[in-house]
Every structure is written in C-alpha cells, then in structure tokens.
Amino acid sequence: FANGARYIAGNRCDKPLKKESPTAQYNLYDYKKELLASYKPCTGPRGTIGIPMGLNMFELYPFWYTFFTKLGFGVFHSPESDRKLYFRGQHTIPSDTVCYPAKLLHGHVEALVEAGVDNIFYPCMPYNFDEGKSDNNYNCPVVAYYPELLAANVPDLKKVRYLNPYFGLHRPRDFAKRAEA
C-alpha cells in the first residue's frame, strides 16, 4: 500500500503470522527406528536366525524377534539399507521391473549370509494382520511372495538354512498350526 502497510492473505507468507515458537511434533519415523534399535542382536542355544530388514519385516520384526528368542534362538537382523547394500545383491536381481525396496532385499540376504547366521527367516505372507479397518488384509504380491524369488535367484542362500514358510498372521489358530510344522 502507498502508506507502507502490508496485507497478507491466504497464509502464504514464509514466516508464520504468529510470533510463537512451533511446538515439537511427535516423529513416528524416529520412534519406529528407536523401537527397532532396542531389539539388540542376541545369541541363543538353538543357533541364530537372520532376518532381512526390508518390506514387511520392519513392521513385523518385534513379533518375529520375540517369537524366535522365546524358542531359544538368537536373532540378528541385516544392516540398514543404503546404496552399498543395494550393490551387494544387485547381481542376483532377475528383473529390473520390481520395486527398489524389493531389490534391496538381495543385499540384505547377502549381508546375513556374510554375517554367518545359521538360518535366514523370510516367510511368504499373502495376508497380514487383520486390523478390522478394511475389507481385506492382502499383502502386495511382491511383499507376499518375494522370499520365493530370493530362494531361486540368490545362490549364496544355499550356504545357510533358508526358511521361507507360508504364514498368514490373519488367523492365529492357523499360524500356531503352521509354526508347529
């Protein structure tokens, strides 16, 4: 305006209109990273189970960690994803059309083999937990069946016992029966 006054509309200003300090927001991503880090690698009298930290295993790691440690296994997870890990397993990727998170899993299982775990556990899971919020609880086909692709394309998996059973966590009774087998 000619008199030097300013008019700001639509809250499009770079600076907030209020002079108050913003309150700290809860960062769910940081919380999840801290939670996963709290599950320390451990040893067990029945050997070690390596878990690749990709796709659905982030969400399910606390469950599987508890499951295997209660059964007497030590649990070890693969390192955090990065470009170096991707290149470690790149030579075993059969198709360039799969998503990048799936491609990373090749490096994760290679890292677990190199770490010397006794077993690598990566189940095929067509269904996930039923949270009662949707009509179905299907996993993406890549998430559900990628363990089969790894078994067929990562030669180093023959150096360890690779466990890729079919589990569905959506029906607890069936899970208990499958886990006994």
Model-predicted regions and their roles:
Residues 1-181:
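An N-terminal assembly and electron-transfer interface module characteristic of large anaerobic redox
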